Curated annotation (Swiss-Prot):
It catalyses: 5-O-(1-carboxyvinyl)-3-phosphoshikimate = chorismate + phosphate. Its cofactor is FMNH2. Its EC number is 4.2.3.5. InterPro entries: Chorismate_synth, Chorismate_synth_AroC_sf, Chorismate_synthase_CS. Homotetramer. GO terms for cellular component: cytosol. It comes from the Bacteria. It comes from Campylobacter jejuni subsp. jejuni serotype O:6 (strain 81116 / NCTC 11828). CDD domains: Chorismate_synthase (cd07304). This is Chorismate synthase. One of its GO terms (molecular function) is FMN binding. GO terms for biological process: amino acid biosynthetic process; aromatic amino acid family biosynthetic process; chorismate biosynthetic process. This reaction introduces a second double bond into the aromatic ring system.
Length: 362
């Protein structure tokens, strides 16, 4: 599906080499201050053009078509479009019938019977422009509640930071070309990416997301737990293969006496749960880790088949990220923001008191 969310519905549209990509955000309350500069800054963070990302250079200028009047949201659908200006579709002519390894070519073709071979169409990371735009709008609502979502890279290839989560440097990451959270490892991360690129290869990455200012009570029980919603959102990002919340996999190696977050004087003494208990936020920071596979588009010679079943060797052309996880950190923040904004709106009717408060009743 192309639509995400329950109360705050986000729909993306467009293809990598189509006319444009964009989104529609429906359900945003009226009266939220719309920060167009922030929206553009988020899109600029996601842009390629550096030696650590795709050479494809797009202006990615957002055009807000509806849902905003005199600087505030109107309560009606917000439509945002970003026109594609630098697509090189001819680079993909040799892939019309070919299935690229680790791409969605094979599965899209056999599911739909048709696929857009130009840059992958809807399966391209270009679609994440829409996600970042939608996430920026969601962040404008979260600001009203002082909820802050931050992401950065803590691992590239075999280089992984051993800093404690509270030691990750988000201020440094804001200035880093690769959103690196560990200043001591930035050069290693960069070299790993460049070495992969120079050898016609790619490399994976690990992204850390922290949400501060969390409220108690976001999320639902059982099938709409906050952690399941977050995992769903993050796993839907291109190239993501795993998500951890709190201690994540490490929790399976721990004793309950160590993993349990004790309370004293009304406060949690630790946060092994990552800010979620029983599928509902407990007010502590949300702690998330998202793991990206190596970009499947590599320039080394590869083997595959075409749609007729013929065995082929081929070499890709085009412009591709040597490490998709770097820009993926911006997308991770966007998806988390969309989930939290949706949960905030859902929580407004979670119990009778909340509902009465919405109408000024006691």
């Amino acid at each position: 599906m192309n639509t995400f969310g329950t109360r705050l519905k986000f729909t993306s549209f467009g293809e990598s080499h189509g006319v444009a990509v964009g989104c529609i955000i429906d359900g945003m309350p009226a009266g939220v201050k719309f920060d167009e500069e922030f929206l553009q800054n988020e899109l600029d963070k996601r842009k390629g053009g550096s030696k650590f990302a795709t050479p494809r250079k797009e202006s990615d200028k957002a055009q807000v078509l509806s849902g905003v009047f005199e600087g505030y949201t109107t309560g009606h659908p917000i439509a945002i479009v970003v026109f594609n200006e630098n697509a090189h579709s001819k680079d993909y002519d040799n892939l019309k019938d070919l299935f690229r390894p680790a791409h969605a070519d094979f599965t899209y073709f056999y599911k739909y019977g048709i696929r857009d071979h130009r840059g992958g169409g809807r399966s391209s990371a270009r679609e994440s422009v829409a996600r970042v735009a939608g996430g920026a709008v969601a962040a404008m609502l979260l600001r009203e509640f002082d909820i802050c979502v931050q992401s950065g890279v803590f691992g590239v290839g075999t280089f992984v930071s051993n800093l404690k989560e509270e030691e990750f440097d988000f201020e440094f990451a804001k200035k880093s070309e690769i959103f690196c959270l560990d200043p001591k490892l930035e050069s290693d991360f960069k070299n790993e990416i460049l070495n992969a690129r120079n050898s016609k290869d790619s490399v994976g990455a690990a992204v850390f997301t922290k949400v501060s200012g969390m409220l108690v009570g976001l999320g639902e029980v059982l099938y709409d737990k906050l952690d399941s919603k977050l995992a769903h959102a993050l796993m839907g990002i291109n190239a993501v293969k795993a998500v951890e919340i709190g201690e994540g996999i490490n929790a399976s190696k721990m004793r309950g006496s160590c993993h349990n977050d004790a309370l004293k004087d009304g406060k949690f003494l630790s946060n092994h749960s990552g800010g979620i208990l029983g599928g509902i936020s407990n007010g502590e920071n949300l702690i998330l880790k998202t793991y990206f596979k190596p970009t499947p588009s590599i320039f080394a010679k590869q083997e595959s088949i075409d749609k007729f079943g013929n065995n082929l060797e081929f070499e890709l052309k085009g412009r591709h990220d040597p490490c998709v996880g770097v820009r993926g950190s911006v997308v991770a923040s966007a998806m988390v923001r969309l989930v939290l904004a949706d949960c905030l709106l859902l929580n407004a009717s979670a119990n009778l008191n909340n509902l009465k408060n919405a109408y000024g009743l006691k």
